């Protein structure tokens, strides 16, 4: 394959479909040296998500197995036909595989669904004021819909409900996200509640990608959205695109990495070293990031990226990213899509906090 290299040159590389796990590489220092703690002066109660290990937010779902209900609804004013799982069966598969791989088996997803559309008791227009991005009363619509499916699903064993509507339904333009106490026939339960909207189908998003990004926020307590550029590099930006891996810093914040996944040093002990990195998008054992601790709050992170299972990039896409994490600063998403950056790492959009 012909690839770009340094000095505007091109070179052919021999590719192989057979990839072996990398041999162990000894890290000069333990993982804890590079895993600097959160040093923000304050954390807003309205934005409690973690930027560093350990995650201390009391809303985190800590158990190993997460039970998720994929509940397909249609409406009298918009009936659906066929088996609804034909729309999202591959999303369920990818959802399970992604979480298993990137959590190193520390988390397991269990999904229950229905192979027929469940008719909502009201036409879709009756829920329009409640469902959609940022609408404060989505809980009302969710409780109404869950009542319509209570004979099919046992909510008492669920952690998350994902309401899936027909792809061509235009009543709900945007998606719904909420974690709250929901009144059900099994009592008042704390559930993550999510619902599709027209935009989610036409961005285009893969349903599993959007849902997983939101669960990383609301269920597992991760801030994400840093670094914000390139926007299509991974799941942390929430932007649908070819990159579907999770950056190693976020993986480490979640407690999902194993010690052998990270090569760590600091400025005092740094010397010439050759470290072979596994691409974040590839399911391959080996060092996933090289980190250098700079100060008590700052760590340099270097990662490799390639076209692979979790990176649907164009042929020949490969490279290395480097970013600095500084845990003194909260993630500032203002200007995230405007490309603004003060170049100092304080007004954040292109640099990591």
Outline where the language-model segments fall.
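Broad, structure-driven detector of short, well-ordered beta-strand segments within folded domains
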Residues: 1, 162, 300-304
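Propeptide-to-catalytic entry region of secreted or membrane-anchored zinc metalloproteases
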Residues: 2-11, 16-211, 219, 223-229, ...
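Extracellular hydrolytic enzyme modules, especially secreted metalloproteases
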Residues: 155, 168-313
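Extracellular low-complexity, Gly/Ser/Thr-rich intrinsically disordered linkers
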Residues: 282-353
């Amino acid at each position: 394959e012909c690839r770009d290299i340094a000095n505007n040159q091109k070179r052919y590389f021999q590719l192989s479909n057979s990839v072996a796990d990398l041999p162990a590489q000894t890290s000069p220092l333990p993982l804890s040296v590079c895993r600097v703690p959160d040093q923000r002066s304050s954390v807003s109660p309205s934005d409690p998500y973690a930027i560093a290990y350990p995650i201390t937010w009391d809303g985190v779902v800590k158990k190993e197995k997460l039970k998720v209900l994929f509940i397909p609804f249609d409406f009298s004013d918009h009936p659906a036909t066929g088996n609804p799982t034909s729309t999202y069966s591959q999303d369920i598969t990818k959802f399970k595989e992604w979480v298993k791989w990137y959590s190193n088996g520390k988390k397991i997803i269990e999904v229950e669904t229905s192979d027929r559309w469940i008719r909502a008791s009201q036409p879709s227009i009756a829920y329009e004021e409640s469902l959609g991005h940022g609408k404060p009363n989505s809980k009302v619509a969710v409780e109404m819909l869950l009542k319509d499916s209570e004979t099919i699903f046992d909510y008492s064993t669920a952690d998350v409900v994902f309401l899936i509507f027909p792809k061509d339904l235009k009543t709900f333009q945007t998606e719904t996200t909420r974690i709250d106490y929901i009144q059900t026939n099994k009592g008042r339960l704390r559930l993550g509640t999510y619902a599709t909207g027209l935009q989610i189908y036409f961005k285009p998003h893969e349903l599993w990608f959007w849902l997983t990004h939101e669960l990383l926020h609301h269920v597992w307590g991760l801030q994400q959205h840093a670094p914000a550029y390139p926007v299509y590099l991974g799941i942390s930006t929430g932007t649908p695109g070819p990159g579907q891996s999770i950056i190693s810093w976020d993986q480490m914040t979640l407690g999902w990495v194993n010690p052998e996944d990270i090569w760590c040093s600091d400025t005092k002990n740094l010397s010439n070293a050759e470290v072979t990195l596994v691409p974040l998008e590839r399911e391959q054992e080996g060092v996933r990031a090289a980190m250098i601790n700079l100060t008590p709050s700052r760590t340099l992170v270097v990662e490799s990226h390639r076209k692979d299972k979790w990176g649907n990039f164009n042929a020949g896409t490969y490279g290395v990213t480097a970013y600095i994490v500084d845990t003194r600063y909260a993630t500032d998403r203002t200007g995230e899509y405007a490309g603004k950056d003060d170049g100092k790492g304080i007004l954040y959009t292109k640099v990591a906090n």
